Amino acid sequence: RELHRLGFLDIASRRGVTVADYAQTGSLETLRAIMDFHGGLPDAKTAGSILQLRYYLEGPAMEELAARHTPADMAALQALQRQAEQAAQEGTDALAEALFRYHRGITFLSGNTITPLLFNAFTRVNLEFWKEYIQLTGIDRCLERLAQFTAHIEAGEGQAASSLLRQG
């Protein structure tokens, strides 16, 4: 019953039990079960899908925030940027956490109440992504990118911020 509830099995009367296509029948709980099985992290294909989902969620949030931000929203975003700059001096782990908070902050400040919860659901995956991103890109480039995001959002250039997000 538990495997059926998680979307791994189909149970049909008179036909019995068959293996289900969990991508079609599963839920967020299914994904968490798969990640737990793999030590809390997704395989490469699933990680790519999660990253793609992030683009789908954060890009529109950037556009929305750029279109309707208040001075308080910009102050909050700039504070998150400063926290990232300070965290960069502490090392990769601290910067990864700050980058996560900055990007989750964008979704929150956009007015969406669900997207930040989805970001929280994938905190561990996000932190691993950010650590790898920092190592590949470098701290200075990460901070430069944050400054660009903040500037585009403040200028009302949501499409530019969203495009920058996709560029990495």
Where in the sequence are the language-model features?
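Short helix-capping and inter-helix turn/linker motifs at the boundaries of alpha-helical repeat units
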Residues: T137-D140
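Short linear motifs at protein or domain termini
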Residues: R1-Y56
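Conserved amphipathic alpha-helical segments that form helical-bundle/coiled-coil interaction surfaces
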Residues: I50-E132, C142-Q148, A160-G168
